[in-house]
Amino acid sequence: MALFRNGNGIAWARRRALVWALFALAFCAAMNIYHYSLQGARGLYLWDKTWLFRILILMGLLPLGLLALSLPLEKIKTKAPSKLLRGFSLVSSFLVSLASLGILAFLIAAPRMGELRKADLNLIDPSIKLESSSRLYDDQEMLLRLSVGSDAHWGTEKTDSNARSNILATIAENKPDLFFLLGDTVETGSSVSQWNAALSDLSAIVPKVPLRPLMGNHDALFGGQYLFKKAFFPEAFSSDSGSPYYYSIETKVATLVALNLPWGTENFDRKQRTWLEEVLKTADPLKPIIVFSHSYFYASGYDDPDLDKPWYDHYQNIPALTPIFERYGVDLVVSGHNHYMEFLEHNEVRYAIVGAMGSKSDPVPAHVSPASKWIAVATFGHVNINITKDYIVVEFKDQLGKTLHEERIRYLPSLESGSNERSPQA
């Protein structure tokens, strides 16, 4: 072991450089392990400026690499090149250690700095059966009334705050049984001030509306899950999945399922998949099934030059989840993430995109999904979902409550005689 040979200054210099390089590697590993344990971090790596996150992963190897390069140079007569590389190794060890500890401290401390305001909200505990209030709709009794919005993005100047407030006021006037907020509530999840701005507006405009938010990719940024749970999932709450990020909500007339898909399938692990299939399999065959998520499935869109990714017909979500929806007869899937409003249909499953709650619209679609039936671009709004005994009525509303488009989905139960389970479709 020449690296640890005692009795000369070179061996001691090697040992010192190696120890510091190992410290740097350990600090870098600890930072990355913590970062990628956070919600949405793996999706951030795959979808947004991947070169930066690859540098953060690989920078811990730089000091060791420089030290390894110095070893062959010790055989030449002049020792200056090897000393120089060892010096660079020591300097890089210090810088990598400092950067790793700084990033780790930021990820831990940022979402915990400042005080989250107490909000006057009617938050719904997913573990409690949802009661509904009936109302007549075109001479039919509405058994359950839902409102859905997504991508409000409090905290950025790219959002139209007036449109957002108008949408909330329209929802408050509608008095739904439940308002689903499908994520990207804030621009940067670790920012307490942005969450406080969101909570302030929600408390002022929809304090009495039963509310159930999902977590989007922006909500999760840099440890934002801590503030999301503190704001929207108190310690007294629970869910059938054991997670605050995905669950089903029991109602008398429908099965409501919330998924944890901030970016794509990065969080769709075996546990969530098994839970989802069990929920769908055992759902009451006489009730419609409506699934909610942040990221979309079928959707029109464009090729994002900044991310170098297709922002349409989601290449992860479609193969991983749509066969499950089709197998168990899901009636409607509602998502955000894409800043349009759109209605689509594929293999008898309907999809609604509602990411238009005030945030800057995505560009005019360069790719129109073959599943698309209707789309509104550069139009702010939300969706109302009214369930009657025969239909799911999907109403796309603009920011002032005007109906832009309506779809009636007749839900047909998939029954097996004597069974209370949905039979998977062939």
Where in the sequence are the language-model features?
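Active-site glycine-centered loops adjacent to acidic/histidine catalytic or metal-binding residues
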Residues: 151, 183-184, 216-217, 294, ...
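Acidic, histidine-bearing metal-coordination/catalytic regions of metal-dependent phosphoesterases
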Residues: 1-159, 165-177, 203, 208, ...
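Acidic-and-aromatic substrate-binding clefts and catalytic sites of carbohydrate-active enzymes
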Residues: 155-161, 187-193, 264-268
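Short active-site segment of divalent metal-dependent hydrolases/proteases
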Residues: 154, 186-187, 219, 255, ...
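Proline-aspartate-enriched helix->loop->beta-strand connector
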Residues: 176-179, 330
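Feature marks short, surface-exposed loop/turn motifs that line or immediately flank catalytic pockets
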Residues: 178, 219, 297-299, 360
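Extended active-site neighborhood of metal-dependent phosphoesterases/phosphodiesterases
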Residues: 110-138, 192-289, 304-332, 340-388
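Residue-level marker for buried hydrophobic side chains located in beta-strands
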Residues: 146-148, 179-181, 213, 291, ...
